[in-house]
Design a protein with these regions (language model features):
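N-terminal pre-domain/capping segments
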Residues: 1-99, 287
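Alpha-helix N-cap and loop-to-helix initiation/capping positions
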Residues: 18-22, 50-58, 82-93, 119-131, ...
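A short, acidic, amphipathic alpha-helical segment used as a generic capping/interface helix at domain edges
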Residues: 201-212, 239-256
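Acidic (Asp/Glu)-rich catalytic clusters
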Residues: 2, 26-34, 50-71, 95-105, ...
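Active-site acidic/histidine proton-transfer and metal-coordination neighborhood
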Residues: 64-65, 80-180
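Active-site beta-loop-alpha junctions enriched in small/polar residues
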Residues: 10-15, 41-45, 75-77, 114-116, ...
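Conserved, mostly hydrophobic/aromatic
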Residues: 30, 38, 73, 101, ...
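Acidic/histidine-rich catalytic cores of soluble enzymes
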Residues: 135-232
Length: 287
């Protein structure tokens, strides 16, 4: 459980790569920027971890030394709403991600549940619950007890991942926690976050359905986003103020509810915008 709001990037920032920093260097470099979270990107993985156990352990050790919380973004090639063979392959990919998360002491594996395809929302939900229960059961067999699985709210209406669906999954399946991607919700609902109350509603619904601890320690993604009638198109930086949502509104709600979320920047300016979000919240907490 976080003792304060934490901020960090989704993946290794370009400036770090430019210096040829190793993965194990990332926590120290983030700490030097005043950031304290990092979401490792495993988005192209298959059915086996694509990181050596030794390297994952080294990342976890350096993260602990620098008080940087780790999460892991799972494979994009997961679809629990697909045909049987697709679902089976998806389960193996998610288990591989959970295995690596355990090695590096990441506390949550974020993943996209899938696309409705020809299935009804009810059938898609039932399939996701069944598959996710089997994944969590397999994790238990493997001794993976300290990693939660985090289904993410999604940015297109063709994708399984409305706020209600994600909260519903977490009500039905143990060892899960919701991942609230504010930009995805904004795009999915065609500009949902216009006022502070729009953010309050998400926080209140999450608390009502999953409890105080679930909302107090939310794992979140944030960026400004461009969208069309089909949902999310692309991410924008915090300086591109003609795109929403407005982080200042979320900062106000975070301070008001005394939340301690982990907020991962998915902006094109990964760590730069994570710092801007952190500073915005700090100003709000002091006001």
């Amino acid at each position: 459980m976080a003792d304060h709001p934490r901020f960090g990037p989704a993946g290794v920032p370009p400036a770090f790569r430019a210096t040829k920093a190793s993965l194990a260097d990332v926590p120290r470099l983030l700490r030097e920027e005043g950031l304290d979270a990092f979401e490792y990107q495993a988005v192209r993985w298959g059915s086996k971890p694509q990181i050596k156990r030794e390297d994952a352990g080294k990342l976890g050790l350096k993260a602990k030394e620098n008080d940087v919380w780790l999460s892991l973004h799972g494979s994009y090639f997961i679809n629990f709403c697909g045909d049987k063979d697709i679902v089976e392959a998806s389960k193996q990919r998610l288990i591989a991600c959970a295995t690596a998360a355990e090695w590096m002491n990441a506390y949550v594996v974020v993943f996209h549940p899938g696309f409705y395809g020809k299935r009804s929302q009810t059938e898609a939900f039932r399939n996701c619950v069944e598959a996710l229960r089997e994944v969590v059961g397999a994790m238990g067999t493997l001794g993976i007890k300290n990693v939660k699985i985090g289904p993410e709210t999604m940015g297109k209406p063709s994708q399984f991942g409305s706020l209600g669906e994600i909260l519903g999954l977490c009500e039905e399946v143990e060892q899960t926690q919701p991942v609230i991607d504010w930009a995805h919700l904004h795009a999915r609902d065609k500009g949902r976050f216009k006022m502070v109350d729009d953010f309050r509603e998400v926080v209140a619904e999450t608390e009502n359905r999953l409890g105080v601890e679930a909302v107090k320690n939310m794992h979140c993604h944030f960026t400004r986003v461009e969208f069309t009638d089909k949902g999310e198109r692309c991410h924008h930086t915090m300086d591109e103020a003609n795109y929403g949502p407005d982080f200042a509104m979320l900062a106000r709600v975070t301070a008001e509810f005394k939340l301690n979320p982990v907020i991962i920047s998915e902006s094109p300016a990964l760590d730069v915008d994570a710092i801007k979000m952190r500073d915005t919240l700090q100003r709000e907490l002091k006001s």
